[in-house]
Amino acid sequence: MAATNDPELTRRKQRQEDFLRGTSKINFDDHIDHCVLSGKTAIVTGGASGIGHGIAQALSSNGCKVAVLDLSGPLEAGTDESNIDSPKLFECDVSSWESLLAAFQEVLIWSGNSLDIVVLSAGVRSHNIKDLILERPAGSTSTPVKPPSSVFDVNLLGTYYSAYLALWYFTNLEAKRDEAEFNWKPQLLFIGSLASYVEQPLSADYCASKHGVRGLWKSVRSHSALFGDCQTNLLAPTFIDNRQGSTKSRGDGALISLTNDVKLGEVSDVVAGALRCLCDRNIEGRALCCVKGEQSSPGSNNFDLCDNLIDFNAGKSVLDSFRNGVVGRLGTQNTTGPQ
């Protein structure tokens, strides 16, 4: 059979190949200029504590006007809300559409109808499914009790609502955007987890929710041009020590146990990953794993997960990171443990 010279078929084959291969891998040697953040408006969900707080502070310190969307309560230490340049808290429940929509609308009024960056970092810890099923209170009946759904409500539904609103506003604000300076694209940054790729035993709701965040990101990353020509990336932090000032911390005993196998990263390692994604125009549709960096060099061991079909959907990168000791240990391989 003669080969076809149909140009449309050729274009379709090329689009399919591009889809399978993904965009260019992250070059961590490229210089990034934080000045591109100056004057931008950012929303950080879950930004009152932990990873979200670290990202909000970094954006603010680089000239961003930062709106933190979180439940009521003071921001972590280091934030002075009386300072006009500090992140501003907009109280809301990300799992409630009405609450989240109202918060986005308030931010748009506050910012003068400007929105350039949305970081989806709102999240809560898992429930252990073994504890829920096997460790029932004395005298409980044999009738199953409905398990809590807060992890799905916040981590997955809240992320979906937030991403939906971000894409909606990026699309509708595109006409008024001035891209002359720095050739800027709106930024949508998903916060997944290493649990989006690797099982975390018995953390059923958390793993399911974080796999869902990854699926949500992958469903829109190749079509971001439809939504205000935005840029979408995903961070997948390993276990992160966010104990300082955080209400989402783990007990020291649990930290020691989990870091026998996985190195414990710092919030600053995730912040470094966020700034790289937000400030580098060449990073688009990529997943970046945030791991423990070298001493005094946050983010220095972060790596591209290569989450594309032709690269085994990150499988090889994750396996290599364990084999090489970047994330932790595999089997009997040694690791440095807590640092």
Curated annotation (Swiss-Prot):
Keyword vocabulary terms for this entry: Cytoplasm, NADP, Oxidoreductase
Enzyme Commission identifier(s): 1.1.1.-
Subcellular location as annotated: Cytoplasm, Cytosol
Gene Ontology molecular function terms on file: oxidoreductase activity, acting on the CH-OH group of donors, NAD or NADP as acceptor
Protein source organism: Phoma sp. (strain ATCC 20986 / MF5453)
Pathway: Secondary metabolite biosynthesis
Function field: NADP-dependent dehydrogenase; part of the gene cluster that mediates the biosynthesis of squalestatin S1 (SQS1, also known as zaragozic acid A), a heavily oxidized fungal polyketide that offers potent cholesterol lowering activity by targeting squalene synthase (SS). SQS1 is composed of a 2,8-dioxobicyclic[3.2.1]octane-3,4,5-tricarboxyclic acid core that is connected to two lipophilic polyketide arms.
Active site residues of this protein: 206 (proton acceptor), 210 (lowers pka of active site tyr)
Residues engaged in binding NADP(+): 49, 51, 93, 206, 210, 240, 244
Quaternary structure (record): Homodimer.
A Pfam family this chain is assigned to: adh_short
Induction section of the entry: Expression is induced on squalestatin S1-producing YMG medium.
Family: Belongs to the short-chain dehydrogenases/reductases (SDR) family.
One GO cellular component term noted in the UniProt record for this chain: cytosol
The protein, known as: NADP-dependent dehydrogenase M3
Main location: cytoplasm
Entry keyword NADP: yes
